[in-house]
């Protein structure tokens, strides 16, 4: 706790300090946590940045977590968005910390990693399609639980996905449908990869009568002051409801339950019934 420089930083960032402390107690000889200014370009936005916390929090960790003083902490700047250049630059970075790692080895590992990432995203999209098809066959509402990839962590989302399912609805993530939308104009500069997915998901469900979106927002997230307004505008332009849930280290879901009950009550006329939470 004492290594966290600001209590206003988002909860996922706070958790990193605990991860680093645990790794230091495991006596590891190196920690790889690079800075990533850019994310992969999915063709949905004007640019493809990571948010400042995702991109540069390794700098904060290096300056504040003194248990890393005797551990090789690799927090160099890398660019996974430039696949052609990545192996050469990654080889140069690793050479500063380890001996005997060749360009060929790094290229082979990078090719395998990019292939696995593509396969992972394909599995997410296929599974999302399966859930949508099953929910429609059963006449159930579909909730797009939208946020960042790390919001899928149960420690961070506190089981909100399961709570939504207890109302009888199906749950999918924004990255399972964002690829179904082509880049479109927004009211703001659409320059963050994760945000672009969010806007695309909101655009997609705008004409889907059995779909609604719930946005997860971390307390202390400055850029979500922008995403919430833009997502609300996209949805309300087409007569859709916008529901926001702020999450942090507090695990009590009482307030969340109220928001969800309100959402399902509001969409009752469209669906014909309101599922009851158990």
Mark where each language-model region is.
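An N-terminal assembly and electron-transfer interface module characteristic of large anaerobic redox
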Residues: 1-278
């Amino acid at each position: 706790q004492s290594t966290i420089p600001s209590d206003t930083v988002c909860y996922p960032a706070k958790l990193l300090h605990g991860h680093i402390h645990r790794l230091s107690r495991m006596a590891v000889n190196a920690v790889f946590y690079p800075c990533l200014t850019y994310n992969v370009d999915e063709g949905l936005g004007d640019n493809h940045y990571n948010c400042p916390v995702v991109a540069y929090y390794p700098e904060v960790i290096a300056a504040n977590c003194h248990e890393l003083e005797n551990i090789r902490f690799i927090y160099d700047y890398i660019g996974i968005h430039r696949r052609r250049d990545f192996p050469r630059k990654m080889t140069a970075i690793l050479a500063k910390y380890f001996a005997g790692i060749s360009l060929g080895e790094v290229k082979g590992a990078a090719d395998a990693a990019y292939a696995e990432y593509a396969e992972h995203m394909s599995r997410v999209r296929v599974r999302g399609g399966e859930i949508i098809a099953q929910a429609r066959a059963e006449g159930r509402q579909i909730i797009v639980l939208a946020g960042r990839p790390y919001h899928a962590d149960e420690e961070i989302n506190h089981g909100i996905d399961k709570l939504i399912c207890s109302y009888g609805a199906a749950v999918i993530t924004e990255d399972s449908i964002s690829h179904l939308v082509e880049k479109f104009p927004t009211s703001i500069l659409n320059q963050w990869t994760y945000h672009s997915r969010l806007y695309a998901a909101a655009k997609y469900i705008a004409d889907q009568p059995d779909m609604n979106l719930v946005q997860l927002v971390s307390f202390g997230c400055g850029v979500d002051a922008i995403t919430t307004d833009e997502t609300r505008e996209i949805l309300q332009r087409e007569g859709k409801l916008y529901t926001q849930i702020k999450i942090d280290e507090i695990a009590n879901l009482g307030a969340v339950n109220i928001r969800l009950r309100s959402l399902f009550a509001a969409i009752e006329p469209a669906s014909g019934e309101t599922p009851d939470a158990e």
